[in-house]
């Protein structure tokens, strides 16, 4: 298989300096605010994003130092595979975060409910629209 390479489109400015400072979603609500700084050449791609209340940040979890294929989530009944979780210790440390979009000023996005460490590279931004993914029958495995 050919290697895959991505260039970040921006970086996160956050109050969290270490991964262990970020609250785990299953333990408490993440109420941190921050800024996503987008590289100037990508500013035209932000047009229309201000119409959404929430966005999905796709990130490279640059501070993750290990990979595990089996983990024990707090809310689970035991060990599960990493692909059955949203945990960060993945073979490819790619994260997705749904954040509230407070506003856009030039190449800066003000966001809240941010669960990323300061300096996290952003690979992509997508509007969050639950109706696009609303499924009639949804099984949520051990999370249910």
Task: Outline where the language-model segments fall.
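Glycine-rich, low-complexity intrinsically disordered segments
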Residues: 1-144
